[in-house]
Amino acid sequence: MKSKVRLLLVSLLFVAPVSVYAQKDSVWLKCPLDEAIIVPPPKNVMKFDEPDLCVGLVSVPDTTVKACITGRVSNVIQNEDEKWDVVFYYRDYYFWYSGLSKVIVKKNDNLKVSQPLGYITPGDKLELSIFKFETPLDPTRFLDCKVVMKTD
């Protein structure tokens, strides 16, 4: 009986810290647009070695783009198409927002969850990419948006 109890205690000492450490690294993200619809990529797109793990978000009533997590702005870029990109980071994660029509943050600004960082034109798509260091991650695994559009 004592050996079973001892084995149980030893296993708890090793298993509990590992599971707590694994949970510590997961990231849960608030949706950057209220009432957003996640738009899947088109079916007939070219496939490359690296999957494009970007997700598109559309929201008719909401055009204010908000931070999905607390972080710090590392870059604000205007593209050739006059749209803006905002990149910010939290721990080892980088969040890349593309397609903003107006930006209200600047490099090195600290962001809080749900803090506005810019706007999109009504009907336009906001693209979100997530990276852990340089490795792209699937945003749908972490994003808390309510509706996913079906493409049948």
Where in this protein do the model-derived segments appear?
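Conserved catalytic core of two-component sensor histidine kinases, primarily the HATPase_c ATP-binding
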Residues: 54, 92-94, 125
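Solvent-exposed coil/turn segments that connect beta secondary-structure elements
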Residues: 62, 70, 78-79, 89-93, ...
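Conserved, short, structured surface segments that act as functional micro-motifs
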Residues: 87, 110-152
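Bacterial Sec-dependent N-terminal signal peptides
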Residues: 1-26
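Intrinsically disordered, low-complexity acidic/polar segments
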Residues: 80, 97, 106, 137-139, ...
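Surface-exposed, glycine-biased beta-strand/turn segments
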Residues: 22-84, 112-113, 140, 150-152
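Short histidine-centered loop motifs in beta-beta connectors
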Residues: 76, 90-114
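Conserved strand-loop elements at the edges of beta-sheets that form or border functional pockets
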Residues: 59, 67, 90, 99, ...
